């Protein structure tokens, strides 16, 4: 019942969808400016607004074998967790090495905006210290 009250308090199910779609838009804008990351699903019409999956397109990363790529992603994820800015954003275990960001309505748009520079920071920190 608390969850239903919360949904009502923010404006109903339409608002939930709006928040999630805006989170995806925030990530899209960030990806479009990035030189190192892309959407795993390249077809914009098929992308999930809740489970946003990203793959690394940087040549530096893609020269590694899959094991080294997973290790690199794990370092990025670990740095973000240590800074307490993101938890559990590693891609699915059976998916190619990737990041998976929850974009559902429980993540406020300002928090999603704040996350993007942190992901850049973690990636570049790992790359520059390799």
State where each predicted segment sits.
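Short, conserved charged micro-motifs
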Residues: 59-76, 107-114
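PLP-dependent enzyme catalytic core of the Aspartate aminotransferase-like
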Residues: 93-130
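Generic non-transmembrane alpha-helical segments
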Residues: 30-33, 75-85, 118-126
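Conserved small-domain helix->loop->beta segment predominantly found in fold-type I
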Residues: 14-16, 28-61, 88-90
